From Swiss-Prot:
Participates actively in the response to hyperosmotic and heat shock by preventing the aggregation of stress-denatured proteins, in association with DnaK and GrpE. It is the nucleotide exchange factor for DnaK and may function as a thermosensor. Unfolded proteins bind initially to DnaJ; upon interaction with the DnaJ-bound protein, DnaK hydrolyzes its bound ATP, resulting in the formation of a stable complex. GrpE releases ADP from DnaK; ATP binding to DnaK triggers the release of the substrate protein, thus completing the reaction cycle. Belongs to the GrpE family. Residues 1-24 have a biased composition (Polar residues). This is Protein GrpE. Keywords: Chaperone, Cytoplasm, Stress response.
Length: 195
């Protein structure tokens, strides 16, 4: 026998124990999960990255929405500025319109000498009203309509058989709106039921 083939009992035991240890080492990874701390850290960083991306996405959406709101508000402000830029000017024209109407009411229409003057005042008033209507100025001065506190100012209440209660009976001073916004309420007498 050669020296390789002859094993002492001690050598055989040590070889067997080495083989058992090798088999146990191979079996160990299958039964016990060894967690690498680097894998845990990677998972934590991936979760943090996902949260940061979500926060960034949310803030981008919020910023876009805010920009859209600012744009829409500024468009509305510009539109209102264009629409109501003439409000003060129209308000200053109202006394002129009132005076022309008073001149027509007080004029002696029977006097033939004043006929051309009266006609001139009528044409002037008509052209002025046509011009301001083009820019959205409307007259509030109808009678026999329901009293509307948004455009009428009740100066007095009168008993009437001819009118239903809360109807405009008489307009003392015409009111005006500019593009739907009240510039001056119509001063009116409102009907009430007889007591």
């Amino acid at each position: 026998m050669s020296s390789k083939e002859q094993n002492t009992p001690d050598e055989q035991v040590s070889q067997e124990s080495e083989m058992e240890q090798g088999q146990q080492a191979e079996a160990a990874p299958e039964t016990v999960d060894v967690v690498d701390p680097r894998d845990e850290r990677i998972a934590e960083l991936e979760a943090a990255l996902s949260q940061a991306q979500q926060r960034e996405h949310d803030s981008v959406l919020r910023a876009k929405a805010e920009m859209e709101n600012v744009r829409r508000r500024s468009e509305q402000d510009v539109e209102k500025a264009h629409k109501f830029a003439l409000e003060r000017f129209a308000g200053e024209l109202l006394p002129v319109i009132d005076n022309l109407e008073r001149a027509l009411d007080m004029s002696d229409k029977a006097n033939a000498e004043l006929a051309s003057t009266i006609e001139g005042i009528e044409l002037t008033l008509k052209s002025l009203l046509d011009a301001v209507r083009k820019f959205g100025l409307d007259v509030v001065g109808d009678t026999h309509v329901p009293f509307n506190p948004e455009v009428h100012q009740a100066m007095t209440m009168l008993e009437s058989d001819e009118h239903e209660p809360n109807q405009v009976m008489m307009v003392m001073q015409k009111g005006y709106t500019l593009n739907g916004r009240l510039i001056r309420p119509a001063m009116v007498a409102v009907s009430k039921a007889k007591s």
